[in-house]
């Protein structure tokens, strides 16, 4: 018997009554001070028979030929390389701000072909390029792979985690730094992680109170302009003082986030509901499979067979109605839904319906 049910987890996010002060560095970032993405293409060698099947992945064979040619090894025409210990991979990394030549960064290596596992492999020297096509780092090293896989002669296979992706800590050496506008002089722009006019105004006020009037001014709901010293050493000390100032951020807007795939419902504290009456019913579908044996008549020459027989039963619960008074809070919403025996899936449907009729004073985000 198979009962179709929906299991959900409801997570309720309660915000504290008094907003805690946060540091400026936790609320905003300096414009221009950011990491940059690097990417590259290379070969992982030394695999224990778990590499690409080059008969199906032609670019792995071509890459291997090109690499051998770089070392002066020319394969005769008509020779088809069929190694099992080589895999074509992509490499990506984050180049942090202010990275200098000679520093090391972590890299992630992912299989591009049909390699079964990268465990035990070594990445050959690979250039990592930025969006402008220039080489900013060189990567090489032995992979650390968290997953593994095993396969039997009969085709059965067991895989734990993802063996086709690995990491190399400090696997790339920075060869070129990215120009940064931080030391160019002029004002510093603080960009809030979450745009909010109240927070922007409070950050500017906190800076002016600590450093001096006219030092900072909000440009919009996401940016604050701060006058800073032109000398690099003084700018570093100034930003160090700036980012440790504490600010009371503005309260988050009323919002409900629903993940329909996992059943997670997150409801902010300031969610309110206008007067509304809700009636919601549910269906329970029960499917029962009872195979039956079909016997042929005597001397008919037929064969005994198994005949599938499925019974489907649908039960509808009686609809229950409840009334939301003006300004109902988060706790009262959940309490009312629980009292009528509604599941989290029903709560999702109720919230969407309340939003449609204009009774829900909150932003509804469905993931």
From Swiss-Prot:
InterPro entries: Flag_FlgI
Record-linked Pfam families: FlgI (PF02119)
Subcellular location per the Swiss-Prot or TrEMBL entry: Periplasm; Bacterial flagellum basal body
HAMAP family: FlgI (MF_00416)
PANTHER family, per database record: FLAGELLAR P-RING PERIPLASMIC PROTEIN FLGI (PTHR30381), FLAGELLAR P-RING PROTEIN (PTHR30381:SF0)
Subunit structure: The basal body constitutes a major portion of the flagellar organelle and consists of four rings (L,P,S, and M) mounted on a central rod.
Protein name per Swiss-Prot or TrEMBL: Flagellar P-ring protein
Organism expressing this protein natively: Nitrosococcus oceani (strain ATCC 19707 / BCRC 17464 / JCM 30415 / NCIMB 11848 / C-107)
Gene (name only): flgI
């Amino acid at each position: 018997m198979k009962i179709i049910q929906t299991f959900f987890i409801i997570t309720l996010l309660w915000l504290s009554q008094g907003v805690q002060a946060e540091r400026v560095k936790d609320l905003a970032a300096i414009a221009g001070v950011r990491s940059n993405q690097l990417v590259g293409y290379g070969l992982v060698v030394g695999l224990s028979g778990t590499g690409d099947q080059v008969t199906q992945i032609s670019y792995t064979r071509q890459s291997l030929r090109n690499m051998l040619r770089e070392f002066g090894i020319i394969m005769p025409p008509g020779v088809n390389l069929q190694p099992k210990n080589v895999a074509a991979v992509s490499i990506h990394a984050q180049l942090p701000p202010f990275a200098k030549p000679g520093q090391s960064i972590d890299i992630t290596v992912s299989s591009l072909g049909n390699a079964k596992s990268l465990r035990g492999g070594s990445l050959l020297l690979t250039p990592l390029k930025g969006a402008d096509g220039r080489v900013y780092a060189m990567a090489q090293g032995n992979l650390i792979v968290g997953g593994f896989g095993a396969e039997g002669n009969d085709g059965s296979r067991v895989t734990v985690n993802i063996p086709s992706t690995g990491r190399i800590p400090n696997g790339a050496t920075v060869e070129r730094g990215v120009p940064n506008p931080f030391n160019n002089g002029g004002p510093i722009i603080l960009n809030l992680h979450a745009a909010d006019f109240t927070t922007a105004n409070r950050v500017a006020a906190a800076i002016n109170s600590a450093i001096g009037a006219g030092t900072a001014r909000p440009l919009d709901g996401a940016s604050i302009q701060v006058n800073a010293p032109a000398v690099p050493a003084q700018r570093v000390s100034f930003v160090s003082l700036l980012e440790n100032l504490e600010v009371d951020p503005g309260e988050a807007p009323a919002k409900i986030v629903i993940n329909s795939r996992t059943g997670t419902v997150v409801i902010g504290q300031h969610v309110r509901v206008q007067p509304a009456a809700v009636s919601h019913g549910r269906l329970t579908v029960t499917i029962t499979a009872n195979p039956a044996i079909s016997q042929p008549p005597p001397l008919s020459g037929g064969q005994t067979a198994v005949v599938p027989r499925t019974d489907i039963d649908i039960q509808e619960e009686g609809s229950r109605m409840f009334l939301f008074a003006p300004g109902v809070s988060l706790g009262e919403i959940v309490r009312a839904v629980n009292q009528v025996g509604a599941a989290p899936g029903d709560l999702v449907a109720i919230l969407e319906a309340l939003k449609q009729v204009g009774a829900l004073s909150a932003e509804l985000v469905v993931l």
